[in-house]
Amino acid sequence: MKLRDFIEIDYILFFSIITLLILGIFFIYSSGVTSTGNLVSNEYIRQIIWASIGIAAAIVLSIVNYRKFYDIALYLYLFSMVPLLYTFFFGRVVHSTRWLRIGSFGIQASEFAKIAVIIMLARYLADTERDNKSFFRFFICCMIVFIPMGIVLSQPDLGTALVFISILLSMTFVSGILMRYLLFIGSCIVFSGFFLVLPLWQTYIFRKNIPAIAALANSKIIILAALFLFIIAAIAMFGFLKFKKRYFYWLVYITAIMILSLGASYAARLVLKNYQIMRLIVFLDPNVDPRGAGWNIIQSITAIGSGGLTGMGFLQGTQSHYRYLPEQSTDFIFSIFSEETGFLGGLVVFALFFIICQRLLRIMKTTTDPFAVYVCAGLAGMFCFHFLVNVGMTMGIMPITGIPLLFMSYGGSAVLAAMIGVGLALSIHIRRYSR
């Protein structure tokens, strides 16, 4: 690496991430201390090891020309499918099949698949820039993302599957793909969630039978409704091809959204485990099961609220040290952090993530290479989604999905994969004016 390249590293991005890693290690340590002051977990030591490996990987990748990943994008993508499939068939940890066991370590293959998808999708978008309005181009983009996403969702890991959607939307938006295509995906997600949650709301919260809502949980009615909508779509498609009227096109568009949303919501009921269904229910009302599925949300909100403006002090939190808050070193690390550092500490984390995303967008804006632009867009979308969903989850404004707070939550796979992405961004920044 030349001295000039060393000087060109984006130190603001790099040290913002180092700061988050250090904060994460301190509060992973805090999560392992009981109310009597005993340390009952060595997770912080493992996190130090993974963070060190991740920092080294980021530095090494910043030295390597990122264009080499353009050349091997397809191979990386196909290779990432192997551990995903192996995990699906053979990996088992607690409630899901998300982890590969290697000795005493668990490897989350889906974390590395995100990076492979970003690289592969960036190459395809860069290679097809001249055809950026094509529906076929958007369809291929969806297939690149939906194949690994489908494997992850079937494990089932809803949270990680949603991260793939954020990558797809952010990268295709930057590529200039027609907004109606992005709106189609977004509408399918919204209506799928609506059709999935509404019967749960009726059963567990409203507790009164509404036939129209109950029908959304009836497989026979869903199939009949989908067939009816399909017939309407077919007639509308014929009308559009024959008469070239735009209202036929939009009728096909809307009915397709409804068909896919009904199908996706029904498939979700078959795939999701009972504990995942309960997470959706307690998101609507945690008091439905305050000592069961709603416990995490209630205790997390209590922890954040008890922190006040300046926090209770390092190692002084009650929710964490009295072990009221489960998964406190992973999903709910922000809850512990806010309890002990308060609102002002939470603002620091918000500011650091804002800086990281701003620096990625700045690199994206200044680089002259389309491949680099799309890689940065995918990384920014992934980092922002992780942050917004995890923090929203701890505050009770998002359902619990198991998405970690990148760079702070305990987890070697997430840290290492994220730092690989950071290394790519640093490499792009160094070479942003050359192709």
Model-derived regions, located:
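Flexible extramembrane loops and terminal tails that flank transmembrane helices
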Residues: 1-13
